[in-house]
Curated annotation (Swiss-Prot):
Residues the entry annotates as binding Zn(2+) 1: C105, C110, C127, H130
Residues that coordinate or bind Zn(2+) 2: C146, C149, H153, C165
Chain coiled-coil ranges: none
Something else known: A single Lys to Asn substitution at position 6 is the probable cause of the transition from the hardened fruitcase surrounding the kernels in teosinte to the cob that bears naked grains in maize. This substitution is not affecting the DNA binding site specificity, but increases the stability of the homodimers.
Low complexity bias: start-end ranges: 22-41
Cytoplasm keyword on record: no
Region (Disordered): 20-55, 68-102, 409-432
Zinc finger (SBP-type): 102-179
Keywords: Metal-binding, Zinc, Zinc-finger
Species for this entry: Zea mays
Protein name: Teosinte glume architecture 1
Organism placement in taxonomy: Eukaryota, Viridiplantae, Streptophyta, Embryophyta, Tracheophyta
Pfam families: SBP
Comment field on protein domains: The N-terminal domain is necessary for dimerization.
Gene Ontology, cellular component aspect: nucleus
Amino acid sequence: MDWDLNAAGAWDLAELERDHAAAAPSSGGHAANAAAAGTGTESRPPAPGAAGAPAECSVDLKLGGMGECEPGAARREREAAAGAAKRPRPAGPGGQQQQQQCPSCAVDGCRADLGKCRDYHRRHKVCEAHSKTPVVVVAGREMRFCQQCSRFHLLAEFDADKRSCRKRLDGHNRRRRKPQPDTMASASFIASQQGTRFSPFAHPRLEASWPPGVMKTEESPYHITHQIPLGSSSSSRQQHFVALGAATPAYAKEGRRFPFLQEGEISFATGVVLEPPAAAPACQPLLRTGAPSESSGAGGSKMFSDQGLARVLDSDCALSLLSAPANSSGIDVSRMVRPTEHVPMAQQPVVPGLQFGSASWFPRPQASTGGSFVPSCPAAVEGEQQLNAVLGPNDSEVSMNYGGMFHVGGGSGGGEGSSDGGTSSSMPFSWQ
């Protein structure tokens, strides 16, 4: 199908020219159309079939008329009518906008300008003066401003001289105060102290396996308890305490008396046996005895018997325990010193026979003129451990009962006190 482009273009241009020429003489009709458009009504051109009506333009988009055909006076009138329809809202003195910018104080009769106050006071509608006043009138009731709640409360909800209400203060204190721990009683705290360390118990506990009168303390890791039943003349058994470890010569220098001895007391300065007190104390503390030796440097230990004690043994030997090797020690009593003359007493035996359990460890020597015997022991070699001698009051046999065991080995010298065949022997003792 062929199109005649020239004929079609000529027809369109001719139609437009005819419409423009017909619209020019009818300017009054266009003014009426412009006034109708200003009032909101749409002007429609007359139908093309009507007599004397111009034909509608085909390029019109029907947006209110053709702009180029509208005169200037009609446009101004339309703009003035549209501006008169938009009237601004009048803002009175008590308008909402003004109230949001400058709120007034909630206290009755207050005319303070909150515009000059801080944002806190403007937000809560209270002036700075009334926020700290003890009593204010709000809505006819006496109230007070709470600085924690930032609200007005009745006076009954406040404590005396408090700026916050009682309810808010209770929650504030619970959040910020920690619970206080229970205070310890000073008396029980001091009573539980033992030495340089503290014990959770006010008094040492007694165990069922301990003998009567024996007490265990933290200061006594080497607390040894043994019983020495004497012969027929002995009336009771005495518990003796031996403390090993670092020797402390303070007792010997100061000459202290130890009241734990039930049948007699000994002063370490003079070595004199004192009379026993009327009532022996129930608690027998730990005793650290022995002065360092001048020759060997080992800490000495002492054992005390009950009746007729007239001599104090000053021996520079140490008690051999489980830690000592079995083949490096022997039993030896190097010397016995008379407390008054301080002379060696090895020539005067005082113990007729020393028995441990039922076996005799030392043969009984011949009795001397004094009627006393001493156990025969070999001379100590270098590195040997020595045992303290135990003094007896009479010629009867003295036996020592122990609860544990410790070994005494035969030295290289092989004296009478060593066991047969060079094997180690066991000596029972109590280790608490």
